Amino acid sequence: MNRLVEEIIKPILEANPQIKKVVGVYGGRFQPFGPHHYKTYKWLAKQVDDAYITTSNIKKPPRHPMNFKEKVRHMSKMGVPSNRIIEEKSPYKAVNLAKKYDSDTTAFVYV
């Protein structure tokens, strides 16, 4: 068993028996999304019930050259299902994503 499961997820589930689902969130700017990001997403998807990438719609070149739609297109070409890419005002706070789940029975793990 890996450290994420052993040190984070397992204790959450043991301390909170009402938790039925663990959602992994990989947030970032992803300007651009590269193979190392994809590898991290695939790893996360194997550890949790549902895995998502959260990113913003900020486009301010040169540091932020891609908007959300462009990022989704790029990530999808690399193999991330488009329904697993969520737009957030801040990619490190999955507010929109959290609305899709029951807060009493879902735990969120951010990587």
Task: Describe every region a protein language model picked out.
Residues 3-111:
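Nucleotidyltransferase catalytic core that binds NTPs
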